[in-house]
Amino acid sequence: MKDDIQTFDVVVIGAGPGGYVSAIRAAQLGLTVCCIDDWVTDGKPAPGGTCTNVGCIPSKALLASSCLFEEIRDKASEHGIHVEEPTIDVPTMIARKAKIVRQTNDGILYLFRKNKITFLNGRGFFVTSDEDGYLIGVEGRDETRVFAKNVVLATGSKPRQFPGVPFDEERILSNEGALKLKSVPSTLGIIGAGVIGLELGSVWKRLGADVRILEAMPSLLPFADSAISREALKAFKQQGIDMEFGVHIDSIQNDGDRVIVQYKDKDGKNSEMWVDRLIISIGRVPFIAALDAPVVGLKLDERGFVEVDAENRTNLPRVWAIGDLVKGPMLAHK
């Protein structure tokens, strides 16, 4: 099985914050390493995972732009700086964000070259296994197979869909679509007052959207200290973001021109929200299907996470899983 196929000490599937760092560290320890990742942006490989491509990095770039706009609009005159009413060029703002993301992508590719890591741009998946390791297939820009003595699974997660409501990334948006809007929506609805919903709501509110957030939990950040929750709620209300808690979403309808959300409020009363765009941020789920895990018998728990022990070992010999694939906070620094 291995005679005409390149063999590596370690193959890492996924090049997000967990995957690319694992690959680099393994290479620094003297192991031969291959890292496989299928993310492509504008026809170019885009390692870095959700954090780099559609998460932490681009959201902070847009947050900085929106904060600067707000400062100029609302605070410049306090400093004796008088400007005409500032206007927003969203495409230029998005282009700046994309440039920052590309710089990060290219930085990771440089680190791979520096550490003599073989990078393959495509979907990595299990083909078969034997007593020596695992045959890994690659489909995408790079089409090949490699043999791994050890495997690190780091394919991350994807946004959770509302049942029966797919993301079209035009009117019904995940975090990815919300970071690529071509103009400021007049009305923006958000389902879920977690990190993603709050941050993106804050960005588009500063830029002029009327933002309304519906949250199933009875309060904002209920698992945080109560004082923090109160101060956060106060800050978001001062921005003018409308929040409603304790709601139950009954249906979401996209009629092409607007999105209609039917829900029950905290008192059980039927209500509706009509918006131009809707961001659904109700959590994320492990991105496991592309691995063809059943081929080798990888064990998952009842929620679809890869089962691991205290050292992140799976039920398969010499296979580890890290990051969003395993239980715990879905955070880049986990």
Give a label for each model feature.
Residues 3-18, 184-194:
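Beta1/beta-strand and adjacent pyrophosphate-binding region of the FAD-binding site
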Residues 11-13, 124, 145-156, 190-191, ...:
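Short hydrophobic core segments
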Residues 14-19, 156, 192-197, 208, ...:
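Conserved phosphate-binding and hydrolysis motifs of nucleotide-dependent enzymes
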Residues 168-184, 277-334:
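FAD-site-proximal beta/loop scaffold in flavoenzymes
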Residues 21, 161-163, 168, 199, ...:
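Glycine/Thr-rich phosphate-binding loops of Rossmann-like dinucleotide-binding domains
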Residues 196-217, 238, 313-317, 324-327, ...:
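Active-site substrate-recognition segment that forms the wall
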